[in-house]
Regions:
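Conserved pre-ATP/AMP-binding loop-to-beta segment of ANL
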Residues: 2-35, 42, 65-71
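Adenylate-forming AMP-binding core of the ANL superfamily, especially NRPS adenylation
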Residues: 10-12, 153, 186-187, 191-235, ...
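Conserved structural elements of the adenylate-forming
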Residues: 13-14, 18, 46-67, 75, ...
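Conserved S/T- and glycine-rich ATP-binding loop of Class I adenylate-forming
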Residues: 30, 36-39, 72, 78, ...
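Conserved AMP-binding A3 loop
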Residues: 31-55, 186
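Conserved AMP-binding/adenylation subdomain of ANL enzymes
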Residues: 54-71, 79-121, 135
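Gly/Ser/Thr-rich phosphate-binding loop
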Residues: 119-124, 133-191, 204-206
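Conserved ATP-binding/catalytic segment of the ANL
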Residues: 220-284
Length: 284
């Protein structure tokens, strides 16, 4: 059901009109353009192709198996890649049901709806997960098989609260809009607390040294899920493909990370938030 609607577009053309005219869509055609927040400059238009999105779905499915028996509860905004790609498109591709709720802020209502719907998969951020846990009754969340956190650091107290109160282990992942969005994720079999999991399949990475940081460096990645590029600010309609000193296709995440011997990634912070003090860089 729809509880809130700010606008509704009604087309005169039947759905089959759009289906017929999209049959010739090329795999590398633009599927969606999502804009970054602009927290470190101007917002950037991230161009993702159909191939990018489908590749990331295949990568994530190796860790989280979306299937037709699942019901996904998604209250995240669809103008963000976490809410759109992970919370909507991936479950749709898996054939499951999806319940979209307009706001993640209703801490009392959302757990009740999860119970009523029998939801099995839930996407949220640390902030919201902590809020739900303070209001939800233990039985409200007993249908959930997967609780997946992203978009911000998952705190230890949030993880412990969910485990002790509901017996649910939160799986933390890591992604960026430019990667459609998932780069790494923990799963039920391979899960290391404090990390964002291991790199998804078919991705390469290297750690770029940063002056003043001995343990860790910049994470640079490449794979079929990496964006086509950014919309050019200078040349209308053109796309600036990702590239580093190693060539085209490599994307510098801007995140300082440590990768352990088992391949689990720990995020130390954004590179631009590290200050050099006494010859060493420390997070601010």
């Amino acid at each position: 059901f729809i509880t809130k609607l700010s606008a509704l577009y009604m087309s005169k053309n039947p759905a089959k009109y759009y289906s017929k005219n999209n049959l010739n869509t090329k795999p590398n055609a633009k599927a969606v353009i999502l804009f970054t927040s602009g927290s470190e400059g101007y917002p950037k238009g991230v161009v993702l192709s159909h191939t990018n999105i489908l590749a990331n779905y295949a990568q994530v499915r190796c860790h989280i198996n979306f299937n037709p028996t699942d019901t996904v509860f998604n209250c995240l905004p669809l103008f963000h890649s976490f809410g759109l790609n992970a919370g909507l498109l991936m479950p749709l591709l898996g054939g499951g049901k999806i319940f979209l709720y307009p706001s993640p802020l209703n801490y009392r209502v959302i757990p009740e709806l999860i119970y009523e719907l029998g939801a099995t998969i839930f996407f949220a951020t640390n902030t919201f997960l902590k809020g739900y846990a303070h209001y939800a009754h233990p039985y409200d969340l007993n249908t959930l098989n997967y609780v997946i956190a992203g978009a911000e650091k998952l705190h230890v107290d949030t993880m412990e609260l969910w485990m002790h109160k509901y017996g649910l282990r939160i799986l933390q992942g890591y992604g960026v809009t430019e990667a459609s969005p998932v780069i790494s994720v923990n799963n039920k079999m391979l899960n290391k607390s404090g990390t964002v999991g291991r790199l998804v399949s078919d991705m390469e990475y290297y750690i770029k040294p940063v002056d003043g940081i001995e343990n860790g460096g910049l994470l640079v990645v490449r794979g079929p899920n990496i964006m086509q590029g950014y919309l050019s600010h200078h040349k209308l309609g053109q796309i600036e493909a990702p590239a580093t000193e190693r060539g085209l296709g490599w994307y510098d995440t801007g995140d300082i990370v440590v990768v352990d011997d088992d391949g689990f990634i720990t995020i130390l912070g954004r590179a631009k938030r590290f200050a050099k003090v006494g010859g060493e860089r420390t997070g601010r």
